[in-house]
Amino acid sequence: GENEKILNVKVEAPEEEILRYLDRKVITKDNPMTTPVLKEVVADAYDRLIAPAIEREIRSSLTEMAEDGAIRVFGKNLEQLLMQPPIAGQVVLGWDPAFRTGCKLAVVDPTGKVLDTTVIYPTAPQNRVEEAKAVLKKLIAKYHITLISLGNGTASRESEQIIVDLLREIPVKVQYIIVNEAGASVYSASKLATEEFPNFDVGQRSATSMARRLQDPLAELVKIDPKSIGVGQYQHDMNQKKLTEALGGVVEDCVNRVGVDLN
């Protein structure tokens, strides 16, 4: 608010009490010639130099305390995201929703291997709902999909409605879960994703990430800069060095706690 020039925050202090205290400390002998001048000097020094310096120090201390508290919350949020229990033994359909460019799909087997990818256009402006349902039914039947992992971004609600309608129409039991897709776009355009899926476009990588986030959240999310995972608001207002160190420490702790498969 202050940066936008909308709010003005000040620290109010008992000025009269402070000036009386300073007068007693500075003016040791009452002299009708010097006392008035010294009082003016004390008042000017307090108003112009001492009070602003103390206010800056207090606000800096409070800001640091607030930042430390916020960073702790961000760390807890990140830990909860990383330590979500994995869902094993399921063939998952990752669904990266969108409007104009279509919804990207990726079928992933229980080991995380990508079996198939495609794009459907059930949302506006194309609204090719029946065509999309036909594609989905074929994928479910062919790969025995048991779980749909739907990203919570743009067109998520519209995609969810299509999934709900589809599940009513098919005889097999398939469930769906909405997952947080924060950081998926960052990962899908990263060098790591390009090396992992050199023949996939950004949409295919993002849909794959949606599926794998359900299967093994920790293994998938460690590929992304912790600040891009969506651990809280106003991250950019924090001390970036402290935030990076804190979130990096959380990632290390979680990986150490779970362990790493060297194979």
Task: Identify the meaning behind each predicted range.
Residues 7-10, 146-155, 177:
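Short glycine-rich phosphate-binding loop at a beta-alpha junction
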Residues 112-145:
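Nucleic-acid-processing active sites and adjacent nucleic-acid-binding tracks
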Residues 86-114, 214:
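Gly/Thr-rich phosphate-binding beta-strand-loop-beta motif of the actin/hexokinase/Hsp70
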Residues 19-24, 102-110, 119-120, 159-162, ...:
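Short acidic, glycine/serine/threonine-rich loops at helix termini
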Residues 124-126, 175-216:
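Short alpha-helix plus adjacent loop in nuclease-associated cores
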Residues 95-99, 153-158, 179-186, 227-240:
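A glycine-rich phosphate-binding loop feature that marks nucleotide/adenosyl-phosphate handling sites
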Residues 195-263:
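Long, highly charged, low-complexity intrinsically disordered interaction regions
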Residues 1-91, 110, 133-138, 142:
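Extended, highly charged clamp/arch subdomains and adjacent linkers
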